[in-house]
Amino acid sequence: MFTLNPNSPMPLVGQIVDGFRRLIADQSLKPGAKLPSIRGFAASHGVSVFTVVEAYDRLVAQGWLTSRANAGFFVKRRATDAPAAIAVPRPVADLRFNAQWYLKQIFENRNLPLKPGCGWLPHDWLFEDGVRRSLRQMAADGAELGGYGLPHGHMALRILVAESLAEHQIAVGAEQVLLTQGSSQALDLVARRLLKPGDPVLVDDPGYPNLMFMLRFLGARLIGVPRTPAGYDLQALEALLAEHRPKVFFTQPRLQSPTGSVMPLAQAYRLLQLAEANDLTLVENDICADMDPELRPSLASLDQLRRVVYVGSFSKTISPNIRVGYVVARPDLLDELAQLKMVSGLTSSDITERLAFGALTEGRWRKHLKSVRDRLADAHGRVAQRLTGLGFELFGEPKAGMYLWARHPDLPDGAELSQQAVGDGIMLGPGQLFLVEPRPTGWLRFNVAFSDDERLYRFLAAQIRLQEAA
């Protein structure tokens, strides 16, 4: 029928649900077919009766099965008409490697147990204990759960953000902090305020695919600024400024996705000079600042928000489910962003913001961040060694943050390689997704927190051997 993997990150209940959904979707189990009894399935697959009960109940709730008293569980007729939200992921052959695919599949496809191409930390690296303690404290305090939040966000958290930024030499008050539903909403608000359809806009190349997709959706004309292992190609940037006269540059100077590179201090000063000379607004996406053990200066700390709009987030290190980000800007611009936030989606979630505030202030946050930084540094060393041992070229060795950018001379097409990897249950990050002008490339983004896994290297070694034998 199907096998269960007790070592998979997917819980056994989820594996059972997915297994039966697939059998029903491909007609291996036809409408009216009877499923194995609960005790029979539990005995044959080595799981508890309670696990099978929960899985069968989920399949009933989702419309795949029907339960008959004293008779058992049966495939429900018209189960193939189940809502799209619970549809079985498309076959491997149907996957399309572009930004839209990446945005959808990296989150939706639950059948890939290993995701070295993803952009978040593993569950056991996150601050879930802090979130649970915050939830319990909110319940114990009798926190009000109804009503809207404030337009700028929960005041106590805004004060905390301002105090945290002061430690990073960014001098702002709480009135200059706008809380958002993650950094994605912050970037979207800034883009919609600063850009019009047809406007040229500078972005890192390679860079953040979600941002590129969003900017294209707004009708902006994307111009890539080449990233190098040492930051930016400033000569190319100066030429692009002269040719296109853009007014906005969205960039991630620190621990950049996908390259992991960091902008040197000398480049930061030069970039600010160019921004001043060319009337350019710099939108600094600094969502990995908490992962930087050196706490290097940001553009915002050097500029004090004259030409820099600063975007941050707690989602990477608390939990992706805690969608709390923020944008910091000069007062007049921030007020306009707050108005735009209200027009487009009213307030952000006050409950989520209070939950984040509780997690950040319950006393263990700094210890958690140090643990994350240490684990990332260790993973960088091991993953870099494994990749270079297979013959991969590293774009750089940042030794911090989540990412390594690498390619192998015998694997020239990262998209084709990624297509093969899906068949082995592995989600890679093919380089063309991160390019302003997508084209075949051998570069791949590796999230070191997910790449310290023998299954990945067995797959890569096998693909290299196939190419060498061809």
List each language-model region with its residue ranges.
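Conserved glycine-rich beta-strand-loop-beta hairpin in the small C-terminal domain of fold type I
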Residues: 374-384, 394-407
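N-terminal basic, amphipathic alpha-helical segments
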Residues: 1-136, 338, 342-348, 378, ...
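Conserved PLP cofactor-binding pocket of PLP-dependent enzymes
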Residues: 397, 423-445
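Structural signature of PLP-dependent enzymes
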Residues: 337-344, 360-384
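Short beta-strand "wing" residues that participate in macromolecule-binding interfaces
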Residues: 67-68, 172, 428-429
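Conserved core of the PLP fold type I
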Residues: 140-278, 290-305, 468-469
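Active-site PLP attachment segment
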Residues: 70, 303-336, 351
